[in-house]
A protein has these predicted regions:
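Flexible, acidic/Gly-rich N-terminal and inter-domain linker regions that tether
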Residues: 1-223
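Radical SAM/AdoMet-radical enzyme domain recognition
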Residues: 180, 206-304
Length: 304
């Protein structure tokens, strides 16, 4: 969101009132915004997100359908939340297929990524903290005017089963805790408390406002440390939360995707595994330092 310039006090009330009455299409809304900016001599044309954030709770629920941004992202009724694990070396070392990793030409970034992907940049902003990343992504869905009551989380960033067991458990635990805490904070009555949401996230605000980001991060971290439970308890709570994680995906390699790994992942709530099968030729696997054989690939597929 761009920095807000001085605005006429009647600008947003007039605009919101018109949207409530007319229920405009996106093109009609764009034209009316231009017309109203000329009338009030306002140089900054507000985005749909800015309009939504200037509405009170009652108006916001009425005009949200006219202001929803990027509706295809949740058109299926499920919101995808991609979270990134911290940069970490694969147990066997680096292979030709992975551009990233610790000490890569892109810096210290997660394996298989360059640091320029949206999910990676979100991870960097939130210091690869699963709890903060989930809060940040849910915040983005809300300001886009989208529903996020059913979430499909994809844990990205490398061979997840190759991370230390405590890290894996903690990462999944804080993901579930974030969904539950976000639900309690902003959906305690069953519907979005927009006033509480805007107050917590210091909205309306400016993209890139470091002071605002620091304040929000401090609030999120304070929540993270409160009322710590077990993973099983958070998963049970999530079954009835306003925002439910209905799918959990991890990434791994064939040699880290055998039956023992699958059983552990099932206990942690994982519902889907992305198995990286780069080639079906042993010679290519050897030359690219992949760290496993075609036999391992076949065994992994059979086991999982």
């Amino acid at each position: 969101m761009k920095a807000l310039v001085e605005e006429h006090s009647d600008f947003y009330p007039v605009l919101i009132s018109w949207i409530k009455k007319e229920k405009p299409t996106k093109s009609q809304l764009a034209l009316y915004k231009l017309k109203l900016c000329k009338k009030f001599k306002q140089r900054h044309i507000p985005t749909d997100i800015e309009i939504y954030l200037h509405a009170d709770s009652e108006d916001a629920s009425v005009i949200r359908s006219c202001l929803t941004t990027k509706p295809m992202r949740t058109g299926s009724g499920v919101s995808v939340v991609a979270t990134m694990t911290k940069p970490y070396k694969c147990p066997h070392g680096a292979c030709t297929f992975c551009p990233g990793g610790l000490g890569s030409s892109f810096g210290d970034v997660p394996m298989s990524y360059t640091g320029n992907e949206p999910s990676t940049m979100r991870g960097i902003r939130n210091e690869y903290d699963a709890y903060r990343i989930v809060f940040n992504r849910l915040e983005q869905y809300i300001v886009l005017g989208q529903n996020c009551d059913k979430v499909d989380q994809i844990i990205m960033g490398g061979t997840f089963t190759g991370f230390p067991p405590k890290y894996r458990e903690s990462y999944i635990y804080y993901s579930f805790k974030a969904y539950n805490d976000f639900s309690k904070l902003f959906f305690s009555s069953g519907k979005l408390d927009l006033v509480a949401f805007k107050k917590f996230f210091e909205l309306p605000g400016k993209v890139g406002d470091k002071e605002r980001e620091a304040k929000v991060a401090s609030k999120v971290l304070a929540l993270k440390s409160k009322d710590v439970k077990t993973l099983e308890e958070e998963q049970e709570l999530n079954e009835k939360a306003a925002i439910r994680c209905i799918g959990l995906t991890i990434e791994t390699k064939p040699d880290w995707g055998f039956a023992s790994h699958g059983l552990e992942l099932l206990k942690q709530g994982v519902t889907r595994i992305e198995l990286w099968v780069q080639t079906i030729y042993d010679e290519v696997l050897l030359r690219t330092h992949r760290g496993h054989t075609v036999k391992d690939t076949l065994k992994s597929i059979a086991d999982l």
